[in-house]
């Protein structure tokens, strides 16, 4: 069995003046940093339909995917995240709209008008999964 350095063909291509694209993992889940992980671990197993987009950056082109997104014990996964991982670069932002196509603010205002005693996390829980609503309300310090 011959073991060859997997980078040798790339080095040879460069020596011949060919343009070589840097490789990196793709179609992978994204992990949270420690502080965010602690806050969002209770959401493990929660899935939402989301619009996940990359923010165009120095090395990133704009891309967006409307698919399921799953909170895991380590971060985010699901079809939308696996797709966007091909475009994301470390240090660049991604944006996840977890109620795409809905005006959440208007829906919450309407819920307040229709049922003023309803807790905000309950009203938001009609738009996104209840556990997600509870974490968002607590994390953002929203009351009313």
Residue ranges and their predicted role:
Residues 10-20:
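Gly/Ser/Thr-rich active-site loops/lids in small-molecule metabolic enzymes
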Residues 1-5, 12-14, 69-72:
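Short hydrophobic core segments
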Residues 8-9, 36:
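General structural feature for long, well-ordered alpha-helical segments within catalytic domains
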């Amino acid at each position: 069995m011959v073991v060859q350095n997997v980078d040798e063909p790339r080095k040879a291509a460069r020596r011949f003046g060919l343009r070589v694209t840097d490789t990196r993992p793709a179609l992978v889940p994204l992990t949270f940093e420690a502080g965010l992980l602690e806050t969002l671990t209770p959401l493990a197993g929660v899935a939402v339909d989301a619009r996940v987009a990359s923010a165009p950056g120095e090395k990133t082109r704009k891309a967006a995917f409307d698919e399921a997104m799953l909170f895991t014990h380590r971060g985010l996964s699901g079809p939308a995240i696996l797709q966007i991982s091909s475009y994301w670069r470390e240090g660049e932002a991604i944006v996840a709209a977890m109620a795409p196509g809905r005006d959440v603010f208007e829906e919450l205002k309407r819920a307040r008008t229709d049922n003023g005693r309803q807790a905000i996390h309950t009203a938001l829980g009609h738009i996104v999964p209840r556990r997600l609503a509870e974490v968002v309300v607590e994390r953002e310090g929203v009351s009313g």
